[in-house]
Amino acid sequence: MPMTTPALSRRAFLGAAAAAPLAFSTALRGARDVPVGLELYSVRTELAKDLLATVAAVGRMGYQVVEFYAPYLDWTPETAKSVRKVLDDTGLTCHSTHNNGPSFTGDGLKKAIELNQTIGSHAIIMASAPRATGIDGWQRVADQLSSIAQQLKPLGMATGYHNHQIEWREVEGKRPMDVLAAGTPKDVILQFDVGTCLEVGADPIAWINANPGRIKSVHCKDWSAGTGYNVPFGEGAAPWKAIFDAVEKTGGVEYYLVEQETGAQSGGELPMVQRCLDNWKKLRA
């Protein structure tokens, strides 16, 4: 899909300029300073009540980055500008968004690009591929990601894929995650959800080491056999220190995103993500 209007070209230039320093500055800061953010699905109930106030509250807690999820595509341009102001006012940044199917075709892609550029995000991540069946289906997903990556590259932007459980289970003798990794160029991000990897018994360290430089962001979601996802980040079974070491030495991580699937039933979403951030600080001390 051509993106050649003068306004979009100007945005593309600005987007490229904004995105380029991230990896460079991360390398200069050192591994321990990789910023920590929040996948805003973790506060979805609060977000639905008051978008701007919830984002501001997350910033005041001390999170450095946020990632918006699929409903953001319903925003108007004015809403995106208001969100950007809150991000700037609280010192938050947004490097990526989670997206469903409409963000990857036609006018949906165009709108996703424009909204992401407004809020400073440079990566349009595919949140899942629920319709993919069989290895041929997963190869089509890889082909789609490759095509989107080509369209986004001149704009200083990227795409990527976020794993769930299904991508680790073999289909016709192959794991869909391996098909996606092998079938896409190296600039397609392999956003790593740790909890779902652990749930199905896959090896997180082996996956990171097999894909050097492609794990640009990590969803820090914990899991344990006894509680499933009903456990705060840092209190489950994930070997976080080994994971941090691998993604910082090999994976190419540029930012972390805490994701907490439970919260409203555990005293509230905002107190829960504060607890997760406190646990993060202990792990990184």
For each feature predicted by the language model, list its residue ranges.
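Catalytic-core regions built around general acid/base machinery
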Residues: 79-89, 144-152, 243-246
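Conserved residues at the C-terminal ends of beta-strands
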Residues: 41, 69, 100, 127, ...
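Alpha-helix N-cap/loop-to-helix initiation residues
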Residues: 44-47, 76, 105, 134, ...
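Histidine-acidic metal/acid-base catalytic patches
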Residues: 2-6, 11-37, 43-59, 120, ...
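Histidine-centered catalytic micro-motifs
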Residues: 38, 159-165, 218-220
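Glycine-rich, proline-tolerant flexible connector loops at the mouths of alpha/beta enzymes
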Residues: 67-84
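Active-site acidic/histidine proton-transfer and metal-coordination neighborhood
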Residues: 17-27, 65, 72, 90-96, ...
